């Protein structure tokens, strides 16, 4: 018997998470209504096959979808403060989300006490850190899965295991967006981290303070807090009475904290005074990825009790994820082409630039989502030889970079931008696609943007794939 049995549940939004919630609620005996403003949402056929009794509402709808409803499950893309979700709250209807349903499921299945949950959020680096943390836990012998915002949906993993009659994961490594955290209750992870907080999604939040406060709710519960001491907003999230592990790209002050130190001219990842791994041996490019690696090690120590010394081999073996400062092509004179199409906000692009150890020709621009582009200026001055701008908010980026003494120009599309960037790059330079913007003004998604960039780079004379 489930708390969902017999309840009339409305699922708002039929993306990956919404579809997983709908399928799970139907499996647990709920009466189901699903509403999506799109006429043909992507999961429609799957929903009809897996939940044939579900009532499906597509296109325009109003508050009538709340009639008879006991519980409203929100997809991450649905803002709980406006529209039907706000009306549901006004009527006193409880709101839930995928992470709350996962927590409830683990309790009802009687496995929560044997399960470890590691939760990861941050403006930048959370997908890489999630994948790395899961890989480290697996290397230590645990049945660990990465799920959530990283895909697959956590409830999809749960349903697949149950359908196969397989044991449930010993460790869930969950990437959580701020949108997912908004509807998260009672997850109580064994360890959680906020990697960083910079401008993003300010089209949804009133400002950076509200955005940061939403991220900080990941620490709800009793688990170990893993905090970035180099980010003032994150460092301020420390809660009284909680176990803390701090990390950063600086030298650690405490013996159980993580950081970077210089020894005889070489940088090392360390825990306290103990050297773990030379930065030069880290496969992931950039000091920002060193910080992500330190966060992953701290999560495994704090949440799983695994000593970092056991995990250095797995760190070296981890090859990273596509579209995150990924080397995709190289010219015969040593110019390298890097795809950071996942760099959809200013903080990500600043981190990518600062992670480079050579002059950079930057390709940036797209849908800026209301961000302040001024933090790009210092990083561009430090690292960039030139900047080629594309997309809707190219003029706003140009305005933020005016007077930087770095060459700026516009290109009509990404293919032309790659050609122009290659012309400006000198031997040994990097051409970096790190847009600091979303992609939907010109592309289907960030992966499509990456495909166009990679194809354009590999068409250039004397360029080969990497």
Curated annotation (Swiss-Prot):
Catalytic activity: UDP-N-acetyl-alpha-D-muramoyl-L-alanine + D-glutamate + ATP = UDP-N-acetyl-alpha-D-muramoyl-L-alanyl-D-glutamate + ADP + phosphate + H(+)
KW Nucleotide-binding (keyword) present: yes
Enzyme class, first EC level, given as a word: ligase
Subcellular location field: Cytoplasm
A GO biological-process term: regulation of cell shape
Superkingdom of this protein's organism: Bacteria
Pathway noted in the entry: Cell wall biogenesis; peptidoglycan biosynthesis
Sequence positions that bind ATP: 122-128
A single Gene Ontology CC term: cytoplasm
InterPro entries listed in its UniProt record: Mur-like_cat_sf (IPR036565), Mur_ligase_C (IPR004101), Mur_ligase_C_dom_sf (IPR036615), Mur_ligase_cen (IPR013221), MurD (IPR005762)
Keyword tags: ATP-binding, Cell cycle, Cell division, Cell shape, Cell wall biogenesis/degradation, Cytoplasm, Ligase, Nucleotide-binding, Peptidoglycan synthesis
Main location (coarse class): cytoplasm
Gene3D superfamilies linked to this entry: Mur ligase, C-terminal domain, Mur-like, catalytic domain, NAD(P)-binding Rossmann-like Domain
GO molecular function: ATP binding; UDP-N-acetylmuramoylalanine-D-glutamate ligase activity
Family: Belongs to the MurCDEF family.
NCBIfam families reported in the protein's UniProt record: murD
Stored HAMAP family: MurD
Known role: Cell wall formation. Catalyzes the addition of glutamate to the nucleotide precursor UDP-N-acetylmuramoyl-L-alanine (UMA).
Protein name stated in the entry: UDP-N-acetylmuramoylalanine--D-glutamate ligase
């Amino acid at each position: 018997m489930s708390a969902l049995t017999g309840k009339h549940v409305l699922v708002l939004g039929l993306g990956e998470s919404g579809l997983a919630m709908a399928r799970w609620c139907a499996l647990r005996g709920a009466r189901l209504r699903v509403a999506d403003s799109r006429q043909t949402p992507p999961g429609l056929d799957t929903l009809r096959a897996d939940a044939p009794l579900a009532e499906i509402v597509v296109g325009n709808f109003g508050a009538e979808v709340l009639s008879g409803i006991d519980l409203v499950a929100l997809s991450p893309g649905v803002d709980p403060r406006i529209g039907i979700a706000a009306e549901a709250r006004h009527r006193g209807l409880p709101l839930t989300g995928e992470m709350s349903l996962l927590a409830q499921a683990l309790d009802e299945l009687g496995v929560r006490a044997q399960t470890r949950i590691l939760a990861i959020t941050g403006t930048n680096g959370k997908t890489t850190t999630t994948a790395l943390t899961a890989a480290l836990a697996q290397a230590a012998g645990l049945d660990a899965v990465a799920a959530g915002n990283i895909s697959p949906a956590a409830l999809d993993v749960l349903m697949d295991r149950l359908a196969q009659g397989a044991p449930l994961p010993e460790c869930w490594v969950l990437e959580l967006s701020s949108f997912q955290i908004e509807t998260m209750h009672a997850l109580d992870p064994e360890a959680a981290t906020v990697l960083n907080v910079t401008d993003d999604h300010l089209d949804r939040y009133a400002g950076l303070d509200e955005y940061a406060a939403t991220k900080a709710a990941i620490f709800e519960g009793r688990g170990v807090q893993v905090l970035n001491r180099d980010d003032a907003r994150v460092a301020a999230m420390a809660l009284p009475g909680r176990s803390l592990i701090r990390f950063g790209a600086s030298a650690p002050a405490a013996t159980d904290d993580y950081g970077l130190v210089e020894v005889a001219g070489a940088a090392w990842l360390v825990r306290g005074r103990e050297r773990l791994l030379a930065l030069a041996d880290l496969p992931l490019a950039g000091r920002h990825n060193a910080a992500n690696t330190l966060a992953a090690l701290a999560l495994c120590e704090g949440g799983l009790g695994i000593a970092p010394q056991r995990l250095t081999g797995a760190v070296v073996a981890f090859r990273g994820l596509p579209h995150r400062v990924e080397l995709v092509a190289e010219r015969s004179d040593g110019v390298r082409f890097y795809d950071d199409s996942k760099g959809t906000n200013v903080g990500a692009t600043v981190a990518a630039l600062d992670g480079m150890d050579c002059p950079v020709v930057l390709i940036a621009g797209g849908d800026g989502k209301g961000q302040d582009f001024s933090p790009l200026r210092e990083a561009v001055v430090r690292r960039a030889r030139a900047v080629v701008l594309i997309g809707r908010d190219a003029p706003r980026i140009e305005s933020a970079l005016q007077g930087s003494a770095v060459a700026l120009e516009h290109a009509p599309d990404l293919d032309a931008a790659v050609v122009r960037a290659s012309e400006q790059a000198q031997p040994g330079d990097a051409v970096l696609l790190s847009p600091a913007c979303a992609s939907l003004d010109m592309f289907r998604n960030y992966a499509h943007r990456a495909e166009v960039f990679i194809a354009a780079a590999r068409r250039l004379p004397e360029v080969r794939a990497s």
